[in-house]
């Protein structure tokens, strides 16, 4: 049995009026928010998928289905912590998390330190082990037209 595993996660949500924009557990001032059953935090959903995938535990939808009433407007930090408990129960510990958020607007740089701190706290790892990169799509495609925000994540796990 291998003692290290890597997981990859991805999520995208449509931007819409009348919703809060939450990324990495941080409410970001913006005229639109992400549409989804939960708080639609695409960054935390990608991290959650990466963790579950690395541990061989499926994906976020199999653990927290968007058809279940108990997850309506759920805080994605709560979902991340619950998923990570399942990962730890299988004997795995997160080593590091590397993510990319693609959003034409708003600028994410001012919010990245708090996003990193939230993920580090939720996983019980040092903030130096969490990286978040904000990118635009150079005005190309649906992301460039500000129709949505996309997030990608990679997670390294080690056997406890």
From Swiss-Prot:
Q: Which organism is it from?
A: Neisseria meningitidis serogroup B (strain ATCC BAA-335 / MC58)
- List the CDD domains: MECDP_synthase
GO annotation, biological process: isopentenyl diphosphate biosynthetic process, methylerythritol 4-phosphate pathway; terpenoid biosynthetic process
Free-text comment on the cofactor: Binds 1 divalent metal cation per subunit.
Keyword Nucleus on entry: no
| Catalytic activity entry | 4-CDP-2-C-methyl-D-erythritol 2-phosphate = 2-C-methyl-D-erythritol 2,4-cyclic diphosphate + CMP
> Which gene underlies this protein?
ispF
Q: Which protein are we looking at?
A: 2-C-methyl-D-erythritol 2,4-cyclodiphosphate synthase
Subunit structure of this chain's protein: Homotrimer.
Kindly give the PANTHER family that the UniProt entry links to this protein.
2-C-METHYL-D-ERYTHRITOL 2,4-CYCLODIPHOSPHATE SYNTHASE, CHLOROPLASTIC (PTHR43181:SF1)
Keyword Lyase attached: yes
Described purpose of this protein according to its UniProt entry: Involved in the biosynthesis of isopentenyl diphosphate (IPP) and dimethylallyl diphosphate (DMAPP), two major building blocks of isoprenoid compounds. Catalyzes the conversion of 4-diphosphocytidyl-2-C-methyl-D-erythritol 2-phosphate (CDP-ME2P) to 2-C-methyl-D-erythritol 2,4-cyclodiphosphate (ME-CPP) with a corresponding release of cytidine 5-monophosphate (CMP).
């Amino acid at each position: 049995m291998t003692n290290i595993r890597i997981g990859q996660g991805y999520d995208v949500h449509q931007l819409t009026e009348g919703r809060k924009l939450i990324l990495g557990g941080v409410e970001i001032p913006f005229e639109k928010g992400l549409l989804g059953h939960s708080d639609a935090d695409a960054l935390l959903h990608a991290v959650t998928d990466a963790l579950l995938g690395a541990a061989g535990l499926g994906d976020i939808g199999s653990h927290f289905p968007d058809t279940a009433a108990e997850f309506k407007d759920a805080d994605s930090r709560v979902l991340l912590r619950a998923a990570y408990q399942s990962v730890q129960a299988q004997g795995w510990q997160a080593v590091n998390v590397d993510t990319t958020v693609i959003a034409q607007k708003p600028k994410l740089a001012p919010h990245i330190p708090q996003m990193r701190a939230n993920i580090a706290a939720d996983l019980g790892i040092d903030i130096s082990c969490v990286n978040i990169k904000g990118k635009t799509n150079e005005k190309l495609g649906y992301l460039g037209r500000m129709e949505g925000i996309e997030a990608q994540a990679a997670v390294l796990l080690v056997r406890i």
